[in-house]
Amino acid sequence: MTDRADLSTDVLVIGGGPAGAAAGYWLARHGVDVTIVERKTFPRDKTCGDGLTPRAVHQLGEMGLTEQLSKYHRYHGLRATGMGRELELQWPSHSVYPSHGYVVRRRELDQMVAENAVAAGATLLTGHEALDPVIDRGFVRGATVQTKDGTTKQITARYVVVADGANSRFGRALGTFRTREWPYGTAIRTYWETPRHADPWIESALDVKDRNGNPMPGYGWIFPVGDGTVNIGVGLLSTFRDFKSVNTTHLLDAYAHQVADRWEIDPT
């Protein structure tokens, strides 16, 4: 079904995640008519460790979000663990960047940045998926978008920013692609309740093992969220010979059992 109520804007941003929403914010702040289209609706979740580095904290502060960020759990650095040893690496002092980060769940962070773009004057269309580019004399001048009810319309623009992620359908329509021979990673995470939810360090383990105790070419993480839970996850590289046979859910379970006593979680 086609709806002919087409739209026009100066800049069309494909993707309303932190990158797209930040682009929309700065464009709107400078008086540009900008429209952001996002396939999902907020709040929506993403697989992520939820950790914001000092550079990210600085950039979000430049966007006026310092007060909102201060409500979340602050951490001071990274604890690296492996082979029975650990090393606490505090964020260094810097003339521009703070010496702390925050842990913010993505379902909250992404909505915060998107709403901030709207407050700056950007138009945000959620539940709108960009299907195909609008091409005019060899230039990308917008997109055909589809809403959840199946209606489609064209949004034309002078400029288009493609920010819909690594698996960009819109990008593929423009001819971009991922070289299959290149390495890539996959990750899985969940949240566990623990009294250590406000630990001042995020943690990364360099000695993740599978259920049989075999070392794996990846890493594990534990990021305290400060709300009674920690974000626990594992990441794995495709360079591993048996990568495709690995069950990441089982790997996460093995890692949770590996850290259960120290982090006071119940992985059962």
Predicted regions and their residues:
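A glycine-rich dinucleotide-binding beta-alpha-beta segment and adjacent secondary-structure elements
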Residues: 262-268
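Conserved Rossmann-like nucleotide-cofactor binding loop
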Residues: 19, 42, 167
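Conserved N-terminal glycine-rich FAD pyrophosphate-binding loop of Rossmann-like flavoproteins
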Residues: 41-63
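A conserved beta-strand/loop capping segment in the N-terminal third of enzymes
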Residues: 57, 61-111
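Predominantly flavin-linked oxidoreductase catalytic cores and closely associated redox partners
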Residues: 116-262
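Short phosphate-binding/catalytic loops that engage adenosine nucleotides
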Residues: 32, 65, 122
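Beta1/beta-strand and adjacent pyrophosphate-binding region of the FAD-binding site
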Residues: 3-19
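Glycine-rich FAD pyrophosphate-binding loop
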Residues: 28-48
